[in-house]
Amino acid sequence: MKTWVIKIGTSILRGTEETSTEEVIETLSRSFTSFLSKGNKIILVTSGAVGLGCQKLNIETRPNDLSTLQATAAVGQVNLMSLYDKVFNKLGHNIAQILITKADFNSRKSFNNASKTLKKLIDLNVIPIVNENDTVANEELKYGDNDTLSALVALAINANKLILLTDIENLYSKDPRNNNDAQPIKEVHNSELKEIKDKNIKNSNNEWGTGGIATKLISAEIATKGGVEVQLVDGTNKKNLIEIFNDNKIGTLFYPVEKPIRNKKSWLSHAIQTVGKITLDDGASFAIKRKGASLLAVGVKDVEGNFTINQAVKIVNTNDKEVAKGLVSISSDKLRSILNNKENNNSSIIVVHRDVLALS
């Protein structure tokens, strides 16, 4: 049995002058049927609520202000789920709506609850349809058109594959719209991904979505580090949908790492939001990266932000490069007090224990 997470972008769902959103969803859902009939499972991560809300309210351009974005998302989400329910009902499939924000994944307990719920739904042969809760979110609306969310969902359920359906054929060496010499990239191994992601790739934003190629590369990096294969595919081509479910190599394949980060450390690395930053000296940086040591107060050079026990912090070296994330054992006030030599006897206190420290 295979479990796949399929992310459907706004550029796919919005359709064209000739094809409605309902027709797009019907084409997509029919392509899933053969895959599901073999006992496989899918979870959909969908965008499109804002776009559909704008259509319903006759708003011609995507709003810029947050309150209007959230209002259109509220209207559009009802329409979006109604379309999914109508189409999947015809094919004899039950669906479930799951609305998530990044804050929901910030708690380990909430992350585990979401994981258990998603797994139970697919055990019951229900197709979960996940979207960011845009009506209450703020940063989420600007963050990545559900690309990052789809990667986190894939990690939460230990998916075999994450499929990113978009409106481009593959990843390219350059933006193909502006560069005639742009070359398609068919395969990306994890050792290459960071360099590709960090290059100055022009974002392929369009008016109705909030994502682009950069967010898809971030999503691919998160998923592959957690052991999930990622496939970037042009979802506007109906033939591609057949090829995907025959497990053919189309679009761009991102291969997972050989030794993935799983469970709690995967959550620490990718799902949790940090509230502060700790700068290490060279010795401490070496100890946690090469020796798997806990972070001690003696190795801390600087502290930024305010945090309390069990909150997450970013841990950087003297060049401000992130080396890890972790949950602190002491507050920022206590740590600053130690650094200011007010408590010399506590310089060996554990700031972040190795069990709750995830290397970047």
Swiss-Prot record:
Name by which UniProt lists this protein: Glutamate 5-kinase
Enzyme class: transferase
Superkingdom classification of source: Bacteria
A Pfam family annotated for this UniProt entry: AA_kinase
Annotated HAMAP family: ProB
Subcellular location: Cytoplasm
Gene Ontology molecular functions: ATP binding; glutamate 5-kinase activity; RNA binding
Function: Catalyzes the transfer of a phosphate group to glutamate to form L-glutamate 5-phosphate.
Binding positions for ATP per the UniProt entry: K7, T166, D167, T210, G211, G212, I213, A214, T215, K216
Pathway: Amino-acid biosynthesis; L-proline biosynthesis; L-glutamate 5-semialdehyde from L-glutamate: step 1/2
Gene Ontology BP, a term: L-proline biosynthetic process
Keywords of the record: Amino-acid biosynthesis, ATP-binding, Cytoplasm, Kinase, Nucleotide-binding, Proline biosynthesis, Transferase
CDD domains: AAK_G5K_ProB, PUA_G5K
InterPro entries: AceGlu_kinase-like_sf (IPR036393), Asp/Glu/Uridylate_kinase (IPR001048), G5K_ProB (IPR041739), Glu/AcGlu_kinase (IPR001057), Glu_5kinase (IPR011529), Glu_5kinase/COase_Synthase (IPR005715), Glutamate_5-kinase_CS (IPR019797), PUA (IPR002478)
UniProt: substrate binding residues: S47, D134, N146
Main location: cytoplasm
PROSITE patterns given in the database record: GLUTAMATE_5_KINASE (PS00902), PUA (PS50890)
Catalysed reactions listed for this entry: L-glutamate + ATP = L-glutamyl 5-phosphate + ADP
Domain PUA: 275-356
Family to which this protein belongs: Belongs to the glutamate 5-kinase family.
Any one annotated GO CC term: cytosol
The protein's Enzyme Commission number: 2.7.2.11
